[in-house]
Amino acid sequence: MPDLFDPLTLRGVTFANRIGVSPMCMYCAGDDGKPTDWHLAHLLQRAIGGAGMVMAEATAITADGRITPGDLGLWEDGQIAGHARLAAAIAHAGAVPAIQLGHAGRKASRLPAWHEGPADPGWEVVSASDQPVGHFAAPRALTEAEVAAIPALFAASARRAVAAGYRLIEIHAAHGYLLHQFLSPIANRRNDRWGGDFDGRARLTLEVVQAVRAALPAEIPLSLRVSHTDWIEGGWTTAETVELARRAKVAGVDIVDVSSGGIDPQRQKIPVAPLYQVPGAVAVREGTGVAVAAVGLITEPEQAQALVTEGKADMVLLARALLRDPYWPMRAAVALGRAGAVKAPPQYDRGWNGIGKFGMRFETGAPFPPL
């Protein structure tokens, strides 16, 4: 079995190790959806820290698909240049630049998480049905024609992402956003071909996968992020996720990023604990043979290593752990006896070249006092 610091190849892209930076919204783009210096500093630092892949935050395929006015976008060509700056910086630091594309649906038009409340001025929100959720605005149900146009919007954004230099594209179909709203019977009450049974509810996501795959060069891998369960009785299930992943693999998905929840934060009952989302990743991997990324309260090097060596995941994605410590991959390499697996850039070499040698403490980098 490979370990955490062995390379992984998907299509024509090789990742130096199995550690990835999950997409995390920074809520600091301009109203034009273009990246700022904050995005550059944030993503570059995590690439320098040794992750094999660094994924830019959920990036909207349309202006009204943003979660907040401060979300990134790739709905027009004028946004490509700013993203090219991010992708080039990530690649220069040795990581594979990746991006997540999505539409927030009924969870759009909000203020950043630290403010709460609706955006002001906001915009009309849309969804599979007119079912409201929690404190979010009541959505308008998309027409059949509007739904049919969504795959082309994802494909256009994917082409822009490739033009910007991103080397892995992820479709966001999780966490209660638009594609998840179509997948889940909690949010999807349609009685046309986009709703009803599993085939109807899965139709939009699979058509998006097909459209994006057709828009990508053959060497660029495609990821699909899914919530494997809604954690609500009568909601989207792990078994349905496995079937969706099976069909998505046939349609050209190379790796499935398995998360959970989000369709109704007030109703979901999540048994939060270390590795609590891993069973979903295992179910998808065992049920389909597709590569999977595991996420969710993975904080220790030994946890991440075991997920890979035990065949539970092909990649491990970290979020909050990497907010706290961008150098988690370097520290993990030392802790797992693979200090040479992640190289600090020469500008930082003086801070790292003694770790693991001369009795230096892993936690602080300070030498042990002489005996």
Predicted segments with their positions:
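Flavin-dependent oxidoreductase catalytic cores
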Residues: M1-L371
